[in-house]
């Protein structure tokens, strides 16, 4: 253990950069990538702070964790991990987002109906001393000792040093709602705010209908993102997400290229009903976690198809923004259906911790 005193909050969590494949060099350890809210837990003498990735307190949104972690974690420790909500269908990120609500009564009700868990994967301090200058391998040993008697909702993330097993995790654990695999150098120190780890996520492609756009910032001659749709079994075009990975030159080219599709686009647009009804189903609808963001959009006649790269679905939509790959002028929009997407085999979440 190091002799320096533990740092005070806030602390930026160490981050990960995307890698295409699992590293095959020696000296890496692999962990599941949890799909939740990143959080640091600061256990003081008689209190506890749950700090978000953007350095804000989360205690009021997760009162059940505030109590449980205060009981189970010893004073003087700082633990890095992920807040998740587990359901019979796997991890539920939407349920997490519903916690970010100003009404305390609603938060407390949800804390009973859909209780959260905390999955620990790193240790920044123990026994009142910093561990950030220790190698990852040593921090893991101390973390395992700290959580030897942990009980739900506190969990220790699994770890493997076998690349083949990590590859199996990458494939199988998605069925429980996990987001990929994280690779950490065993010799690495904890570096707040630095992308010192690797994250390997699922990579797939899909052909989608382009049915709208959003402008780039306050410009009306540059596209910020394209709104994507897929047809369901009933023949209804559903909004599934956005793609926004464009250079500035591409943004201006797209504005010119798509201008003809803006003409008379709203008259028979498949998403017009959601606009008129002001429901939460339309691509411009507000949610409690997007208040203040400009979600206005410009409808396009749904006549163009593009291929995008995505990682996985959350419900009926892409979990993250997709990456634009190319136009598919050879494909009719009506052929862009949900049934083209890869179906993930369900995987019991409890088996992840038994891995």
Regions found by a protein language model. Give the residues of each.
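Catalytic cores of nucleic-acid ligases and guanylyltransferases
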Residues: 1-355
């Amino acid at each position: 253990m190091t002799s320096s005193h533990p740092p005070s909050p806030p602390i930026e969590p160490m981050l990960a950069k995307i890698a295409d494949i699992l590293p095959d060099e020696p000296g890496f350890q692999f962990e599941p990538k949890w799909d939740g809210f990143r959080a640091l837990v600061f256990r003081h003498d008689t209190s506890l702070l749950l700090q978000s990735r953007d350095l804000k307190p989360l205690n009021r949104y997760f009162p059940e964790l505030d109590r449980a972690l205060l009981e189970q974690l010893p004073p003087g420790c700082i633990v890095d991990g992920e807040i998740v909500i587990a359901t019979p269908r796997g991890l539920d990120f939407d349920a997490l987002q519903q916690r970010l609500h100003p009404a305390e009564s609603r938060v407390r009700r949800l804390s009973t109906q859909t209780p959260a868990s905390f999955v620990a994967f790193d240790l920044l301090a123990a026994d009142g001393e910093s561990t950030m200058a220790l190698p990852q391998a040593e921090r893991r040993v101390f973390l395992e000792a700290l959580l030897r008697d942990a009980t739900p909702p506190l969990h220790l993330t699994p770890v493997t040093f076998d690349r083949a097993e990590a590859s199996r995790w990458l494939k199988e654990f998605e069925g429980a709602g996990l987001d990929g695999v994280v690779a950490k150098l065993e010799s690495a120190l904890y570096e707040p705010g630095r992308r010192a780890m690797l994250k390997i996520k699922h990579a797939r492609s899909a052909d989608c209908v382009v049915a709208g756009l959003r402008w780039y910032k306050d410009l009306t001659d540059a596209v910020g993102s394209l709104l994507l749709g897929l047809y369901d079994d009933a023949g209804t075009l559903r909004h599934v997400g956005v793609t926004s990975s464009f250079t500035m030159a591409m943004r201006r080219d797209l504005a010119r290229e798509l201008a003809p599709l803006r003409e008379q686009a709203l008259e028979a647009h498949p998403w017009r009903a959601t606009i008129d009804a002001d429901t939460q189903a339309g691509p411009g609808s507000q949610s409690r976690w997007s208040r203040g963001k400009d979600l206005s959009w410009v409808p396009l006649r749904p006549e163009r198809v593009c291929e995008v790269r995505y990682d996985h679905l959350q419900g009926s939509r892409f979990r993250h923004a997709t990456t634009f790959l190319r136009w598919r002028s050879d494909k009719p929009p009506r052929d862009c259906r949900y049934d083209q997407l890869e179906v993930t085999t369900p995987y019991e979440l409890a088996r992840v911790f038994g891995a």
